[in-house]
Amino acid sequence: MSLLTEVETPIRNEWGCRCNGSSDPLTIAANIIGILHLTLWILDRLFFKCIYRRFKYGLKGGPSTEGVPKSMREEYRKEQQSAVDADDGHFVSIELE
């Protein structure tokens, strides 16, 4: 039997909960761990892009360009922009007569 479950028993034609040993330290610790786990999971799902980008790159906004000549940085930026511009032509306009 799990420590985290409550036992439902019929009482006077109604359903009630009977919690045995709710002051048990192990039960309290398990409840706290469960609540923390749920909270962290929700925060992870809400902010996963920000969190993992922060772990990957630290406090910087992106990958380091340290030691890369300025001309190469500019060329890379232009390539990235042209790739984005080229993707705009992916959609085809169809005109019906």
UniProtKB/Swiss-Prot annotation:
Q: Which residues lie on this side of the membrane: Virion surface?
A: 1-22
TM ranges: 23-43
Which residues, per the entry, are lipid-modified as S-palmitoyl cysteine?
50
Membrane topology category = Single-pass type III membrane protein
Q: Which GO terms describe its molecular function?
A: monoatomic ion channel activity; proton transmembrane transporter activity
Question: What's known about how it's activated or inhibited?
Answer: The M2 protein from most influenza A strains is inhibited by amantadine and rimantadine, resulting in viral uncoating incapacity. Emergence of amantadine-resistant variants is usually rapid.
Question: In which compartments does the protein localize?
Answer: Virion membrane; Host apical cell membrane
Q: Which InterPro entries match?
A: Flu_M2 (IPR002089)
Q: Which GO terms describe its cellular component?
A: host cell plasma membrane; membrane; virion membrane
- Give site residues, Essential for channel activity, possibly by being protonated during channel activation, and by forming the channel gate and the selective filter: 37
Major location (coarse): virion
Does the record's keyword annotation contain Membrane? yes
Q: Which key words tag this protein in UniProt?
A: Disulfide bond, Glycoprotein, Host cell membrane, Host membrane, Host-virus interaction, Hydrogen ion transport, Inhibition of host autophagy by virus, Ion channel, Ion transport, Lipoprotein, Membrane, Palmitate, Phosphoprotein, Signal-anchor, Transmembrane, Transmembrane helix, Transport, Viral ion channel, Virion
Q: Which domain of life is it from?
A: Viruses
* Pfam families in UniProt: Flu_M2
Sites of Phosphoserine modification: 64, 82, 93
List residue numbers at the site (Seems to be involved in pH gating): 41
Example GO BP: protein complex oligomerization
Give me the stretches of Basic and acidic residues compositional bias. 71-80
Q: What domain notes does the record hold? A: Cytoplasmic tail plays an important role in virion assembly and morphogenesis.
Q: Which HAMAP family match?
A: INFV_M2
Q: Which family does it belong to?
A: Belongs to the influenza viruses matrix protein M2 family.
Its biological purpose is as follows: Forms a proton-selective ion channel that is necessary for the efficient release of the viral genome during virus entry. After attaching to the cell surface, the virion enters the cell by endocytosis. Acidification of the endosome triggers M2 ion channel activity.
Protein name listed in UniProt = Matrix protein 2
What taxonomic classification does the UniProt entry list for its organism? Viruses, Riboviria, Orthornavirae, Negarnaviricota, Polyploviricotina
